[in-house]
Amino acid sequence: MIGAFSLCLNPLLFTMLTITTCKTYPSAPQNLILVQTQLSDQGIPTQFLPWQETLQSHFILPLAAWDYANFYDEFTQWIKQHKNAFINPAELMLWNSHKGYLCDLQNWGVNVIPTIICSTKTSEILTALESQDWPEFVIKPAVGQSGNLVTKLKQGEVLPDLSAYGEQVVLQPFIPEVATNGETSLIFFNGVFSHAIRRQPPQNEWRANSQYKVEIIPVEVDSHIIETACHVLHKLPEMPIYARVDGTIIHNQFLLNELELIEPALYLDRWEGATERFVDVLKSKILK
């Protein structure tokens, strides 16, 4: 029914699925162009458009909305405005857009890197740190993307200028294994494991984000690591259609660093069949 209905619409005014980019980075990444091509070839018209533009689309996939942290209020309002159109549940994405979700997962029994959320007031930050035995710690914005403004400090060091960090910050212990072991990302489609990669920081770098020239390595992971990551997803009130579970493997145990439910890089081009698996799960969502 949906496929037949779409043929009656002016393609210049309407499309079945919009994969949103952003005004800051409007170009579509190549691996998502392959998703667009496969979906369109299979009868699901798909376009790219910045999330800040007016959308006329049944479904929205915000996988390249890479600037939302800089326009957070507008972005969350946009999600609420189009809440019934998103591939992933809107309430899950709103929850996931602020790193306070890590505290929730911690409270739900997930093995999460210890996380404190507090205001940007120096006195509050120092009070929070006093009760922690962290020789080194990391401070980052509570709303942030791609490792921006992530800073490592030693106890007693002067805090950086926090004027660009927003209203709240995240405090976490520095985990040296991130630099040595890298960060392992497990990608799931509708709760089913698809593939995994490891982001390995270069020498003398400890951040595992792409802007820091990490090496992206496809990896096989042990079944118990997959089960641990899957367990994280089953803690959620709804199962996301797509999810990336990021963590560091320390002594063969998975320590959760991040759960990405909005605009994760899915590394579809790094594993044979990954694009096809993603397209299949999108089709099932759209055509059900």
Where in this protein do the model-derived segments appear?
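Short hydrophobic transmembrane-like helices used for membrane targeting/insertion
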Residues: 1-2
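Active-site nucleotide/adenylate-binding loops and adjacent lid/helix of ATP-dependent enzymes
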Residues: 17-21, 78-83, 87, 91-181, ...
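Conserved N-proximal alpha/beta basic substrate-recognition cap immediately N-terminal to
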Residues: 22-119
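Phosphate-binding site of ATP-dependent enzymes
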Residues: 148-233, 248, 255
